[in-house]
Curated annotation (Swiss-Prot):
Cofactor note: Reduced FMN (FMNH(2)).
EC annotation from Swiss-Prot or TrEMBL: 4.2.3.5
Origin species: Ruthia magnifica subsp. Calyptogena magnifica
Subunit structure as annotated in this protein's UniProt entry: Homotetramer.
GO biological process, one term: aromatic amino acid family biosynthetic process
Protein known as: Chorismate synthase
Reaction it catalyzes: 5-O-(1-carboxyvinyl)-3-phosphoshikimate = chorismate + phosphate
NCBIfam families: aroC, PRK05382.1
Amino acid sequence: MSGNTIGKLFTITTAGESHGEALIGIVDGCPPRLALTEADLQGDLDLRKPGTSCHTSQRHEEDLVKILSGTFEGKTTGTTIALIIQNTDQRSKDYGNIKDTFRPGHADYTYDQKYGFRDYRGGGRSSARETAMRVACGGIAKKYLKQVYGIEIKGYLSQLGPIKAENFDWFEVHNNPFFCPDASKVRTLEEYMDALRKSGDSVGARINITANNMPVGLGEPIFDRLEADIAHGMMSINAVKGVEIGAGFKAITQKGTEHRDAITLSGFKSNHAGGVLGGISSGQDILVSIALKPTSSLRLPIESIDKNGEPIEVVTKGRHDPCVGIRATPIAEAMLAITIMDHVMRHRAQNSNVASITPIIPASI
């Protein structure tokens, strides 16, 4: 299996399966002398880990990350950083009934066709369990970007099923299990999820992610446009079916006079572009939104086939999230951080001595 690495100068490689012994992460390209301990990475892992509320999977993983290499005396050395997270709460017996069957909406059929062999326990490599290591690796990028460039990456749940956040307060995001910025919607979300869980069904969600205090100049103008690499990273997250940058699909109904962002010496007057112009960061906030599909693992029956092509009815057992979007915020933050970090390293390597005479325009007024 290829395709387990992302990035060019700042790269992360992950390994491990849902019910394997552990998850492994390899980070290459982190500059030296960055103060780094496990505590710097654990906070986001704790936000993502399962079993923290009745609205998520009841699999109980501590998700404790350990740094195996790449640091000395609490600082990065500039060499490869290796990370490990042990899996401790596997219940593989829950998946014995799908060993020779295909769950609709999952990667069972495609993995079987591509490799001729698959780890059916919890979805194996295709499980979102893999994203725990992305969050750990992304924590390194987040710390470097914040410490060296002042870039801060934050996300929140803007919609769960039919329920949209209408008010916004960053303080509320980490004050409820949904990462919802609207305190007035929390009770509604709880009631909706309680009813959904009892029905045995699932639902999708929308997550918004921003990167503040961005420098100008990150990204390449053609195939490695900043927004293209952001979309690549976001679409690599399990269950993500759509990505928007800035105005996104709203641009379809906007007139050009509305969509273009006026520029003054005092700042951009709007940010419909989402912080990227011509594939290169403008210095405005990066604005990203992702859509996540409903979980396919349901206790409600559905038609499928077995490995012999015989028709069957599938009912999925195990512990699953009725809405994967609830735990997706730290994952999306990590992928945005990893992408921006890679472009920071690339810009530093190629353009560190460039000095434009044009004044730097502040972000939106």
